[in-house]
């Protein structure tokens, strides 16, 4: 937008630009008329400023590092809302779709600033769950056309964030809000994903039952007693690790362990002691299987391929060590107390490069061996 104008020496002028959107030309015209005039524009701008001051000022920290203070006291919250929740865009993907896990994990950071937005996103995501328990990996509003996949962690973010929300807000009422399930065809054998518009099922359930269904859907384990990775976990690029239904994920084991622990408490609050006990028992078994199978001497493995080949052992030419398998051994409490310090020391030693200021996600990159974990190998 541009406006030509002339100014004399010492003269001041105020130019107001109005930018908005409507569903059609009539709505756009109506909105534009509401914001005519300098005072109306000034009031609208002041309202925006106050919104951001209240939102970003709700949580303040003070540390000896001014850079940390700046990024924490406002910038991260602003970025989460404007870019992640509203803009939904990035350098690699500028599609504007809602990602099931993406925006759920983002709203966790808003629990102390805009908890109502976290609640809203949780309920929105519950409405994108298929009746079988899996979910749309991503979808485009307003109609909801999106992709159904075999990715193994998406649906588990619903109980994870719900339990976290309830714990930090004490808003138990959200568990009783109902949402319909989605219905769509199941993935065919050998089919990794498909893009389609599902229909709203006539069947509905409370948020609590949506979460229970997600957890039950995730209790599928492989030969080592760890969760099946499917065609990717938190790392979508590992889409070939478990494409034939047998590959397992160590990171997902830690994540699921955390969910089982936290949702056991949520189930108790909801007076579902039977499912609370189920979560506790499954968590206990999972921790035993992690202890017996996932350790590789100095750090935790990352996964196993369908054929039983481990991903993340010291003997690998590629991805000898993966960051999130080490960090989540601590974050979840699922790692062996006598081993997690060694795991984190190994991560620091192998992944932190102070000279160039980066922390690698894994090391070495997938560029030496014939191992094909998926499209992560195509990133440059």
Question: Which residues does each predicted region cover?
Answer:
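Acidic, mature catalytic/reactive cores of soluble proteins
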Residues: 1-380
């Amino acid at each position: 937008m541009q406006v030509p104008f002339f100014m004399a020496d010492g003269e001041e002028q105020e130019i107001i630009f109005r930018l908005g959107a409507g569903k059609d030309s009539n709505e756009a015209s109506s909105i534009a008329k509401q914001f005519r005039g300098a005072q109306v524009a000034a009031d609208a701008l002041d309202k925006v400023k106050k919104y951001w001051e209240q939102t970003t000022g709700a949580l303040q920290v003070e540390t000896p590092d001014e850079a940390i203070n700046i990024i924490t006291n406002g910038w991260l919250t602003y970025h989460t809302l404007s870019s992640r929740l509203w803009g939904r865009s990035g350098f690699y993907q500028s599609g504007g779709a809602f990602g099931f896990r993406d925006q759920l994990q983002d709203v966790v950071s808003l629990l102390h600033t805009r908890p109502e937005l976290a609640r809203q996103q949780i309920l929105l995501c519950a409405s994108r769950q298929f009746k079988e328990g899996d979910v749309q990996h991503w979808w485009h509003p307003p109609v909801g056309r999106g992709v159904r996949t075999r990715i193994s962690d998406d649906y588990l973010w619903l109980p994870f964030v719900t339990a976290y929300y309830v714990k930090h807000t004490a808003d138990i009422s959200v568990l009783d809000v109902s949402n319909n399930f989605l219905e769509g065809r199941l993935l065919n054998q050998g089919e990794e994903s498909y893009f389609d518009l599902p229909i709203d099922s006539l069947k509905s359930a409370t948020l609590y039952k949506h979460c229970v269904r997600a957890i039950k859907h995730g209790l599928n384990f492989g030969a080592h007693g760890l969760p099946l990775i499917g065609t990717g976990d938190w790392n979508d690029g590992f889409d070939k690790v478990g494409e034939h239904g047998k590959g397992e994920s160590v990171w997902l084991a830690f994540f699921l362990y955390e969910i089982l622990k936290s949702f056991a408490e949520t189930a108790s609050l909801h007076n579902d002691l039977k499912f609370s006990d189920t979560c506790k028992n499954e968590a206990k078994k999972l921790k035993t299987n992690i202890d017996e199978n996932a350790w590789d001497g100095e750090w935790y493995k990352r996964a196993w391929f369908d054929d039983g080949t481990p991903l993340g052992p010291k003997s690998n030419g590629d991805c000898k060590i993966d960051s999130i398998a080490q960090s989540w051994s601590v974050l979840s409490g699922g790692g062996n107390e006598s081993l997690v310090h060694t795991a984190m020391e190994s991560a620091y030693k192998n992944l932190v490069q102070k000279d160039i200021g980066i922390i690698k996600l894994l090391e070495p990159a997938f560029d030496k061996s014939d191992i094909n974990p998926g499209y992560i190998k195509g990133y440059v």
